[in-house]
Amino acid sequence: MKAYFIILTALFSSCVSNHYDRTESFTFSWKIGDFDQASQEIEKLAESGPKRDRMLYRMEEGAIKRLQNDFEGSIRAFSLAGDYYEKWFGVHLQSQTKISEELGSTIGSQEWKPYKSRVYERVMLRVYQALNYLQLGKEGQARAEIFKIRQAVSDAKDIWQKELDAARIMMREKSMDLDNGLENQMEGSLYEDLLQARSLVPSNLPDFVNPAAIYLEALFFLHGTNEKSDLEKARFSLRELYGIYPANPFIQEDYQQAIKNRSSKIPTTYIFFETGRAPVRREKRYDIPLVFFSATSRIPYAGIAFPHLVTNHNYLSSLEVFNGSEKSLTLPLADFDAIVANEFTKNFPIELTKAILGSVSKGALQYIATNAVRDESEEVRAVTGVGVGALAQGLTQSDWRSWTTLPKQIQFCKIPSPASRELTLRGVGTKLRESIILKPATINLIWIRSISAQTPLRVVNQFVLKP
């Protein structure tokens, strides 16, 4: 009995430290703009932190090194993150672990499982990696990363369908009806939080789509090469963007160029502006009502821990660009509140299945443990009851993990490049300013990062798309 209790205690103790605790120092350093300290913190986690989280740490590391203008270091970190993706999903989604097995592993906390990333994260990994290569003048490698953006979205649709099918099967095996629970009389705080997430998503945003990734792809094919097939790719991407932003004058102009099979010869600069911080996940406890269970189920309800999205509101609202004679204001392109919420609601049935199955499994564990000592003394039964209860509570945790250094929004504008080649950037409503000397070229691209309305503007990328 003593050994049994020690095992329970050890298991419970292992639940205490979570991802939020481990990354708190790193996140704080990044938020205040101390990128050197943040880089040291995340490198340490990437090398010696839990192996299950290494992919996430490498993505964070790659993002921080970009802010330090360490593009070679960023490439290495993102390449290692990409290796984890290949490990989890393999070529053409031939993963080593079946999705049904992954869903069926429900005893431990969701945070104990390897972090395999979310779709919007995999897309941004490829976007940042393409920008890294373009900064270093490696157009061939950048082209390969841009193709991987489309592949990530295509893979995501297949993965999502397989996971949803597996979730339905697993729930049926436990005498629970997933679709009935979601479609009929779902109510309470969990439903309210789901509706709140849905309210962040505009009706014209397609599933798993990041407009900033599409636009970078379009500009690369419109201005970066002279091949006819590339102009066709640019036209395809800009048509998709035009469907999302039909009133955006910059997209309209580029789309017309693609339709005419020629890019502008007027010296122009594109400015991309990352601002704020992406939504984070935080845990809430919910009771799941009877509606999720079939008439043959003997379980009246299940208590679960489930994530809800928390948006960040401290951000620079827009960037003004001045070329000496005219001004241009950045306009919305990719809203990560919407992108993250869209994927969150899309995956809601799958994540809910994991949470419910985990709760049921832990309930069974409690029953087995207490039943095993029913003939023992009252003291032993009490200690066992407390121990397994604490263990179940510790194991009932949602997955808080996500790529936290992503922005709240990516905005953009374009402006004629002046003869002086000097641009002045100003944070709207602030005293934040930055001056940039452009390279002599037909098409320049600038990538700016702002973490909050108080932190300085950071020039991350500056390169030539068309000489």
What are these regions (language model features)?
Residues 29, 65, 133, 221-222:
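Residue at a conserved register position within TPR or TPR-like alpha-solenoid repeats
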Residues 91-107, 171-197, 272, 279, ...:
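Glycine- and small hydrophobic-rich membrane-insertion segments that are intrinsically disordered
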